[in-house]
């Protein structure tokens, strides 16, 4: 006797994902769906930038001109907010001794003449850079990532080759602290003396010192590429830097230190203890005309298969799709995970408000980068740089 079998009916229901979940599961599909509607996953237009809000010099020791925080070692700072991302930049400094005198600092006429002949050989040697450390907070601890090290190195190299920070702006014009007859101390600085003879006689030293600047850049709530945000925040912070004045004690200016080499020969070397003034400072003199601001762009091809179609006319629209024709669009100011992971062809530009361009980086890995796209991105970068330059207000 055959046993009766019952067939169970299985119903399959379509699963609907929220936009943020779909962006995680299939970022490329999420991006194409949004682009087919003429908007981006962040609900901005193709060439629309995020709004930027900044706060300058609020973390510095010189934030309050009437009350200097002597326990604070930050010389300049900036807090930049772009969309949901916050970038905090703080600049500190130190003083180093120049181990070898520059050719132009020597008194010998022959060496000076040699410098004049060879000075055009390497112009970049007349400029310095900042030593940045980028930290992208992700709620974990550990060693720095490859991305953080790459961005830090790129920031250092870009500042150097943009010729923003001349070495002469970092020269320490050391003063001399002397004791007065009433027991008080006073400090004389070379640029504050009216008598040039007294300046050359008493304050001329063979030892040379220079300031060195360090930048710590912390990125919070990262939602996309961060190099342009770090660069712009660093530009704002550099414009607010004030360098503390430095001096040496008059009683220590004539000290000599004996250095023995292998116990046989001895050389006499001057020794100084250089001290930073707690109250006096000078602004950092940078090349304002070379200040540039960063912007990034992405090129993506619209996929007809991923477009949202009207259910009433789905058959007609399927016939009209031409797979050989792929429209390419330019996306400004990449944001969200869907755009960062799905767009492989990118353009990164450093543009000055004056119209000069300091850096252009093209990365091709997906859509074709056409000359029209490059021209459009250069134009947008100039407009963006002009807008960001007006936001700086100390």
Curated annotation (Swiss-Prot):
Keywords (A to Z) from UniProt: Acetylation, Cytoplasm, Exosome, Nucleus, Phosphoprotein, RNA-binding, rRNA processing
Effect seen on changing residue 246 to T: Interaction with RRP46 abolished
N-acetylalanine PTM sites in chain numbering: 2
An example Gene Ontology CC term for this record: nucleolus
The keyword Acetylation is annotated on this UniProt entry: yes
Record bears the keyword rRNA processing: yes
PTM-bearing positions, type Phosphoserine: 26
Location, primary (coarse class): cytoplasm
Recorded consequence of changing residue 276 to Y: Interaction with RRP46 abolished
UniProt GO MF annotations: mRNA 3'-UTR AU-rich region binding
GO biological process terms held by the UniProt record: exonucleolytic trimming to generate mature 3'-end of 5.8S rRNA from tricistronic rRNA transcript (SSU-rRNA, 5.8S rRNA, LSU-rRNA); mRNA catabolic process; mRNA processing; nuclear mRNA surveillance; nuclear polyadenylation-dependent mRNA catabolic process; nuclear polyadenylation-dependent rRNA catabolic process; nuclear-transcribed mRNA catabolic process; RNA catabolic process
Annotated InterPro entries: ExoRNase_PH_dom1, Exosome_comp_Rrp42_subfam, PNPase/RNase_PH_dom_sf, Ribosomal_Su5_D2-typ_SF
Pfam families noted in UniProt: RNase_PH
Subunit text: Component of the RNA exosome complex. Specifically part of the catalytically inactive RNA exosome core complex (Exo-9) which may associate with the catalytic subunits RRP6 and DIS3 in cytoplasmic- and nuclear-specific RNA exosome complex forms. Exo-9 is formed by a hexameric base ring of RNase PH domain-containing subunits and a cap ring consisting of CSL4, RRP4 and RRP40. Interacts with NIP7 and NOP8. Interacts strongly with RRP46.
Additional facts recorded: Present with 3180 molecules/cell in log phase SD medium.
Protein name from the UniProt record: Exosome complex component RRP43
Organism: Saccharomyces cerevisiae (strain ATCC 204508 / S288c) (Baker's yeast)
Gene assigned in the entry: RRP43
């Amino acid at each position: 006797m055959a046993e009766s079998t019952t067939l169970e009916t299985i119903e399959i229901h379509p699963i609907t994902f929220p936009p943020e979940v779909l962006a995680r599961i299939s970022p490329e599909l999420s991006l194409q769906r949004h682009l087919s509607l003429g908007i981006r996953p962040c609900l901005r237009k193709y060439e629309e930038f995020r709004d930027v809000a900044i706060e300058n010099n609020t973390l510095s020791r010189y934030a309050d001109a009437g009350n200097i925080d002597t326990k604070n070692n930050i010389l300049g700072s900036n807090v930049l907010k772009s969309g949901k991302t916050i970038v905090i930049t703080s600049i500190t400094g130190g003083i180093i001794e120049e181990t070898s005198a520059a050719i132009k600092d020597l008194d010998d006429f022959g060496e000076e003449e040699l410098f004049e002949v060879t000075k055009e050989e390497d112009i970049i040697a007349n400029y310095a850079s900042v030593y940045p450390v980028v930290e992208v907070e992700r709620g974990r601890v550990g060693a720095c990532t490859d991305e953080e090290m790459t961005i830090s190195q790129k920031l250092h190299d870009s500042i150097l080759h943009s010729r923003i920070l001349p070495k002469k702006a970092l020269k320490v014009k050391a003063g001399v602290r002397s004791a007065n007859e009433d027991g008080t101390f006073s400090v004389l600085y070379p640029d504050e003396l009216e008598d040039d003879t007294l300046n050359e006689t008493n304050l001329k030293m063979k030892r040379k010192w220079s300031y060195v600047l360090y930048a710590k850049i912390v990125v919070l709530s990262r939602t996309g590429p961060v190099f342009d945000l770090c660069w712009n925040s660093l530009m704002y912070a550099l414009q607010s830097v004030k360098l503390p004045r430095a001096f040496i004690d008059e009683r220590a200016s004539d000290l000599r230190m004996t250095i023995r080499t292998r116990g046989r020969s001895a050389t006499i070397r001057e020794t100084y203890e250089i001290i930073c003034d707690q109250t006096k400072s000078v602004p950092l003199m940078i090349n304002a005309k070379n200040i540039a601001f960063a912007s990034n762009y992405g090129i993506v091809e619209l996929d007809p298969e991923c477009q949202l179609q009207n259910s009433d006319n789905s058959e007609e629209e399927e016939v009209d799709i031409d797979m050989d024709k792929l429209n390419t669009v330019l996306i400004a100011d990449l944001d969200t995970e869907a755009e960062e992971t799905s767009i492989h062809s990118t353009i990164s530009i450093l543009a000055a408000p004056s119209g000069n361009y300091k850096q252009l980086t093209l990365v091709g890995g997906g859509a074709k980068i056409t000359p029209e796209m490059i021209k459009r991105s250069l134009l947008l970068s100039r407009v963006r740089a002009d807008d960001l330059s007006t936001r700086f207000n100390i």
